[in-house]
Amino acid sequence: LSAFTRLFCSDIGGRRLAGWWTRQRRSYFVLKLPHRWWLVGSDGQLQSDLDVPQMEHFRDIAERHMQAGDKVILCLSQPVWVYAQKYRNMGRVFDETDLIYLREEVYAKRGIDVKVYLTGDLHHYRRHEETRESAGTAEPVQKITAGGGGAFLHPTHEDDFSRLREAAISEDVRSRTFEVCATYPSTAQSARLAWGNLLFLFKNPRFGVVPAAIYLMTAWLVGAASGGVSPSNP
């Protein structure tokens, strides 16, 4: 996060960037919403932990402004619940303890509930809902992947994520289970689209011609710029 902070959030060297003036002072935020809801935007980059200043900022906001009974929508950089399941199936571990710590130590101990997890990264839509057995009498937690704004579509049929398990990290934190409630595209539609890639050359024949021309021109320009000099043998 230090590089992002230095470029976009620091007064050192000015805040102008491409004709714009940056105003943010951190890469994460907390926004108060109506009806006692809060929007919390964390910055874990990709496969990185929430750093200490970020965690302390969330703790400070919770202590000074939030109240017991408030609810949180937590925005993440990636669907850690999906990656944790995928790693578990491969016999590996995907560390999600920082998010569990944020939920349990920063919010839950103050009576604040994280009810919605919202992320992108994977370019499709998938919503997991906490099972009734796991939620008990409480309102089920929602975990939503909404990455439809990506330049391409990620498949939804490659692995089975119909049921997820969030492991307990201590005796005080219970394990939780989630079931998929909605997916777009559906697994069947995703599989059909994947098989359709075999016909891509016939569906879009110009796509192969254009990159080939660009690569050829690039190679010619590089060769011309270097004067056609090749390294001599020793």
Model features per residue range: what roles?
Residues 1-73, 83-182:
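Extended active-site neighborhood of metal-dependent phosphoesterases/phosphodiesterases
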Residues 80:
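Acidic, metal-coordinating catalytic cores used for nucleic-acid/nucleotide bond scission
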